[in-house]
From Swiss-Prot:
Pfam families: Big_2, Ig_NUP210_15th, Ig_NUP210_16th, Ig_NUP210_1st, Ig_NUP210_2nd, Ig_NUP210_3rd, Ig_NUP210_4th, Ig_NUP210_6th. The modification Phosphoserine is found at S1874, S1877, S1881, S1886. It is a single-pass type I membrane protein. Residues 1-26 form the signal peptide. The gene is NUP210. It comes from Homo sapiens. Residues 1853-1887 are annotated as: Disordered. Residues 1830-1887 are cytoplasmic. This is Nuclear pore membrane glycoprotein 210. Glycans are attached at N44, N337, N405, N484, N681, N801, N926, N1039, N1116, N1135, N1362, N1441. Residues 27-1808 are perinuclear space.
Amino acid sequence: MAARGRGLLLLTLSVLLAAGPSAAAAKLNIPKVLLPFTRATRVNFTLEASEGCYRWLSTRPEVASIEPLGLDEQQCSQKAVVQARLTQPARLTSIIFAEDITTGQVLRCDAIVDLIHDIQIVSTTRELYLEDSPLELKIQALDSEGNTFSTLAGLVFEWTIVKDSEADRFSDSHNALRILTFLESTYIPPSYISEMEKAAKQGDTILVSGMKTGSSKLKARIQEAVYKNVRPAEVRLLILENILLNPAYDVYLMVGTSIHYKVQKIRQGKITELSMPSDQYELQLQNSIPGPEGDPARPVAVLAQDTSMVTALQLGQSSLVLGHRSIRMQGASRLPNSTIYVVEPGYLGFTVHPGDRWVLETGRLYEITIEVFDKFSNKVYVSDNIRIETVLPAEFFEVLSSSQNGSYHRIRALKRGQTAIDAALTSVVDQDGGVHILQVPVWNQQEVEIHIPITLYPSILTFPWQPKTGAYQYTIRAHGGSGNFSWSSSSHLVATVTVKGVMTTGSDIGFSVIQAHDVQNPLHFGEMKVYVIEPHSMEFAPCQVEARVGQALELPLRISGLMPGGASEVVTLSDCSHFDLAVEVENQGVFQPLPGRLPPGSEHCSGIRVKAEAQGSTTLLVSYRHGHVHLSAKITIAAYLPLKAVDPSSVALVTLGSSKEMLFEGGPRPWILEPSKFFQNVTAEDTDSIGLALFAPHSSRNYQQHWILVTCQALGEQVIALSVGNKPSLTNPFPAVEPAVVKFVCAPPSRLTLAPVYTSPQLDMSCPLLQQNKQVVPVSSHRNPRLDLAAYDQEGRRFDNFSSLSIQWESTRPVLASIEPELPMQLVSQDDESGQKKLHGLQAILVHEASGTTAITATATGYQESHLSSARTKQPHDPLVPLSASIELILVEDVRVSPEEVTIYNHPGIQAELRIREGSGYFFLNTSTADVVKVAYQEARGVAMVHPLLPGSSTIMIHDLCLVFPAPAKAVVYVSDIQELYIRVVDKVEIGKTVKAYVRVLDLHKKPFLAKYFPFMDLKLRAASPIITLVALDEALDNYTITFLIRGVAIGQTSLTASVTNKAGQRINSAPQQIEVFPPFRLMPRKVTLLIGATMQVTSEGGPQPQSNILFSISNESVALVSAAGLVQGLAIGNGTVSGLVQAVDAETGKVVIISQDLVQVEVLLLRAVRIRAPIMRMRTGTQMPIYVTGITNHQNPFSFGNAVPGLTFHWSVTKRDVLDLRGRHHEASIRLPSQYNFAMNVLGRVKGRTGLRVVVKAVDPTSGQLYGLARELSDEIQVQVFEKLQLLNPEIEAEQILMSPNSYIKLQTNRDGAASLSYRVLDGPEKVPVVHVDEKGFLASGSMIGTSTIEVIAQEPFGANQTIIVAVKVSPVSYLRVSMSPVLHTQNKEALVAVPLGMTVTFTVHFHDNSGDVFHAHSSVLNFATNRDDFVQIGKGPTNNTCVVRTVSVGLTLLRVWDAEHPGLSDFMPLPVLQAISPELSGAMVVGDVLCLATVLTSLEGLSGTWSSSANSILHIDPKTGVAVARAVGSVTVYYEVAGHLRTYKEVVVSVPQRIMARHLHPIQTSFQEATASKVIVAVGDRSSNLRGECTPTQREVIQALHPETLISCQSQFKPAVFDFPSQDVFTVEPQFDTALGQYFCSITMHRLTDKQRKHLSMKKTALVVSASLSSSHFSTEQVGAEVPFSPGLFADQAEILLSNHYTSSEIRVFGAPEVLENLEVKSGSPAVLAFAKEKSFGWPSFITYTVGVLDPAAGSQGPLSTTLTFSSPVTNQAIAIPVTVAFVVDRRGPGPYGASLFQHFLDSYQVMFFTLFALLAGTAVMIIAYHTVCTPRDLAVPAALTPRASPGHSPHYFAASSPTSPNALPPARKASPPSGLWSPAYASH
């Protein structure tokens, strides 16, 4: 049963496999696997599917079993292990099936088990260098047919080093090699090798390394017993030293000069120099060839072996060879050599660095080098013993250093001007010091031009951004240089500059560097910066802010912006006159804004004007809004009234020499923002009798009051004038001044009093120092106390002022307190007891910040002579009685506490110190809260110790009991636990670079703890992986932060976490901070060279992963444009730089930061000339050579111009057509490219000869400026020589050779492999070094030498015969490479395609050719493939090194470049145009219901068509054979066309919703009688007249009918208006159909058989039939337009029969019908005795005709009842009805009839009842007969195009005249007239 079940399963799997692959099928990793037969071990191979979950089955488990890996709960897996289970040696096969449990898809793999027939060793090289990386050797096993086994995993081998018979010249050669295990190395082996090495077994893969130089042989055999007869595999390895010769290039020397050679060795990647002479190597000069006039007996050069110095003796050449001293090693390895040419000096050359231009700049350092060349321009080695005399004018140059031989000078340019440098090669100095003068010195001169450096003025300009481009302009001045400058702007979006230096602002915000480069040397330039920035701040410039009422103020504005770059540098804008400013006045009525704005000035950019209208001050607000910019500035301005005197209003009283404090009001008030700047200036009427001084008491807060100190110089009266104003200040730099006058009177004093200005302490506690003596006052030693000195007259009245008295101030301790003249007595107005104001004299005492007790005494001894003399008082005057007063002061320091705020970590081991300093020493401390901290004051130390108790905050207040202090000293203490940790770090770092991470610990209020608390928290910072290193730094960002240095050491991502331990011992971690280490970010290619209109894509490598969007930008957008995808398009001639930025967002600031960037250079140029790039000029017949067009430089390759728009066309021609064949690049694939893509061609040599190859490059649009000088075309021509291949004519045999490149290998294969015993050897003689090596397995390998060798292949047949082949092997360098394309594209009519079809996968194969065009059989090149853009094709590596696979994915042109990685000169370019291969080209989107006829010219090789398929048949159903598709649903779909095993292309199709479905009635043309088609209504789905897209073949039209597209639509009908009680479906059948000829849908309408009721209703009421169509089962709304179809139900009579008699000879009948039918209605009678004529016609609604039916012959019916038929018919519609007519004769009994009485008459009169009875019977019979024929007679009538019934054409029109009324064929005649458009019912009889 199991076998039967397995058979059923296999049958099922076979059926599933036969069904074919699905559209998105999964794949296995291998189709067939070959496993070796083993007994001791089991060899496994793992099968893996790309996706899905599978159940696995082996058809023959005894041959190969299958075991799933990683079964899930559904007992399925994606991987399984195949194991060889065969027990007997044989070749058997088992089929492995894998069935997807979800989709049912079945995958298949064949497992073959066979015996190993042969093994061989595979290696990458046969040469090893000492101390180099080891070499991996691998066994490859073959079966008897030469097939390679898939795996040898687990098979045990024995590897041994054996004696090499051919290496006898090497001593102990078997010790030169060592076998390593992978466990000893740093390399990762396969997993099974690791397991075998652990079991001390050797597998199929090993490592070997060289121990010493020599040759060694390695042998491997299978240990499995069954393979004991399999011949072991052997390989011979050569171990060498890596030796270099320095210099390695050819050297040119002068006679008498020398050069020192070095021999170097490479070991482990390091170059070390060998000491020469050496016991291993020696240098030799060979092949000395003297010049034409040289001495053959003398050597050209000599070599000093002890110094390795080569000295040139005479003209000629010689070879320097490095060789082995050991004879046995001389042929084993190849050592470098060099050629030495001894030449005469030809001329001198000058170079300068930097710049390489001889236009220099003063102050710069330059290096000048004089080079020697021979007459062939070969650079001669400048040795130290030559002498070059150089003259550098000291006036222009400062020589900093020079070389001994005079060839190198380091100088500084000093002076502006023009000069010349002279140099002459004069002599050569030999080793003995002898000077050999050249007979003809080599001399040259270099002219030099020197300029001063270029500077631009101004250096910085700033402008605000405005939406209008070019809002601001400025002319920049340049100084220095040659005067001819090239101006440039780094950002044209910010600012542009003209050739004359006129700068214009652009449309973007930012900064632009304006540079002026010297045209003569672009290295020299000057620059300035233009900033176009958003306004950041606005302020008013210093100006006058006070105005008298009625005056105007000008208020200038400064608007500033932030400089870009993040440095927060603020700069004032140069011009903001275009700003739309809004002005607001805070207090209305004080100032009124005036229209207009101030022009820009040196200190402002704009401004406003206001007018003072009333006294007062106000704030003026100016604001600016634009977008997100909101700026505002405020300024305070004031308006004042004229100044007037208040106290005294007119007179003031003072003593002689004293002063009076006068109060004035009005005038300019003290500036509200800076009142201290207020001043009053006073003048007197008589300056000889008074002194004036201004005074501003601090106690006054009335800014309208002004105080004047007037000093009396003589008794009397005086008029005082006062000027009031403010001194200049920051907010009032230009104040106003107002004047006023008052009268002044003097009088003498009598006594003085002195009192302190004292305030009691705030606390109720008293100071211990206070005593009962009120004259003892404690004061602060930091604040100057004031004493109140008063003067009284004899009557005890207080004087206004006494400052003119001679007051002697004394202090008992001047070191503590003193009175300084700089602090004169101040006069303060105070109210006395009477309410009158008196002046108090306040004297400030100057303290000196020292503590102690002192007494201050003030004594008035008289008038102050100095004051009197300075006031010029009049003498003599009465003496003053001495007066005095004193007071004692105690001076102490103010109490201070530090710090004033501290945060304490809540930890028992932490306490904070508050240092209390100074004060009186008597303090009282209290806290705002009692349970947060504990405070203890240590009086001895002056420290308050604070211990944390609970989290919270508390304010500690220190009160000084003995000091007048405004407030106690306070310190706020915060106690907090740890809330969180915060890490700030940039989340990306480039590998090898560093960033800093900052860690803070935050308390409960999110405030940071001090860093000194971190040791109590055990703070640590850790990384999740070791891709970064963390080092704590000692540097501190602040007192709250610890800094770590992060260095990226490996690429990847990790996270940072900081952690601390809290008071409870719990570990608190920060949120992980992600950080990525990324590789360096680079843009490729490094330089982009483009033609105008050409495009190239810039790609990137490295950078952060996953890489965010790269922001591309270009420095000069007028030269080129760059898209977001990196596509660079050339616009104009010039240079630029494309910048690629990788940005990230700073987590803390939210700002975008640049984490990496790179630049590439862009050059947009025009083609000055074209060149044909041909790798060789001589080629052999039958060979091919690629050619392509380039510019005049290497950068001007096809990538630069191949895809330019408008493009170039390339036209190739040869002068001799029979010599060369020109072929397109894709000729082998049957693709013929148009001329615009033919920048690259292939050339085939046909016959020998020489021909010219010419290309003409034409510009499609010469005005686009792509060619130099707006040329229309450029051309180039080369000569190509084609020569015949060398052949033997006698005997006439083919002599072939194997062509190999250096360091390549090939496996030779013969037709006798496996059948005969083959041996290989090289036949070169012992004197010739072979250029190739071959082993016994036929592996032919070439070395680095070029040349030819001969190999011999001998086959020993088992039957005794031997065969020998001798083949020449040529080793030659690769000259060029050529690319071919596959597969070949076949078309129906063999026509060539113009592009690669879209969706196709093609393979490009690279062929390598030598300098004759022959193809290499083996090469060692490593190829690179690149495209100019990546959006049209996808490129990937092919199955071999010389292939690549390209898949076309989009329509467009892509350029492909192929080059050798080691030899960039070996390159080729190809065009890859991609076009649609499937027609038709759809002008617009398809709609549901469209029928599409797809076509393509692509066929198979046999010319057979491929298979069509659709990615979604539910949307677009397609016939697989013909390509007919029907759009069934809305959506996007891909149509595939596939030629099995050959090609596959596709086309994208979009199916949309039709906007409307419109029905249109089709008016038919004239039709014949026999046509019976239904009436049609054309249905247009969508906006097109036809729903058939594309050109359809007859076969496709047949398939369209089979697809039944009409099922997509449904037809509906309805009466309009709906006046009937039955639906239209009871009358009409409406069916959808599709016309394949016209491509149109239509609805076919057929009328049913009508009942009498239906016919009556339809005839009596007017209605229309409306036919519409809709999409079947559509869920979207579409406009439906119906069509009205006219119809007629036919003719209808109001009577079913007519009865006539001789008494009733006439009757009326009314016939209803359509008006167009009734107009031509004909009536026919079946008997001449009955006549009908129209009586009344009505064509209204309903339409009818009334007929009168009468009997012509009165005797009719006298012979018996007459039965006949009236037929009403329409010749237009062929409609007809038949009405039976019966005529009966009745005898009148009232008198004789017209013919007299008769017996028959009497009979009738007697038997009247009988006659009526007979009449009834006859009439009934007639009616029955007519009804029978009407119903049962076969009808030839059908529904015509307008649903009109028609008669058979065989009936005569005169049928009724010749036929009996009772004939069964009594139907209306047929008419040939075509009916009108409409619907008509059949001619059914009415009963």
